[in-house]
Amino acid sequence: MPIENALASVAVKDVNAAIEWYAKLFGKQPDSRPMPEVAEWKFERGGWLQVYQLPERAGSGSFTLAVSDIDEHVAQLTELGVDTSHRSSGSKVKTLMIADPDGNHIAFAEAIDTSMAR
């Protein structure tokens, strides 16, 4: 069963507040608003992130963003006032963990080992 792509989704308390925060994080407004309580961002090399308003589940999600230069992202996130102190590095990958305003966990991952998938 071939998989063409993937869509990550996270619940938020207020979709409009989440749109404001994620638009700053991604440097662009959502690519799609399929419903009033849903916003979606498409990534250049594939994949989507969907945020949807469901207050009772907000803050319980997590997803990973694959990046080519984690230090560049740390600098940009620091400028936005995001806590970038949760970093780690191994022989295969560097990671940074942050949280959105609702407490959803976001991992940034940079492959060091070229055999790792991007």
Describe the predicted segments one by one.
Residues 5-13, 54-118:
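Vicinal oxygen chelate
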Residues 18-23, 77, 103:
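Conserved active-site tyrosine of GNAT-family acetyltransferases
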Residues 1-19, 61-63, 112-118:
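N-terminal beta-strand motif that seeds the catalytic metal site of vicinal oxygen chelate
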Residues 13, 17-21, 38, 48:
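Secondary-structure boundary/capping motif
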Residues 26-33, 82-87:
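Short secondary-structure junctions
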Residues 28-61, 105-112:
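Conserved short beta-strand elements that form part of the metal-binding/catalytic scaffold
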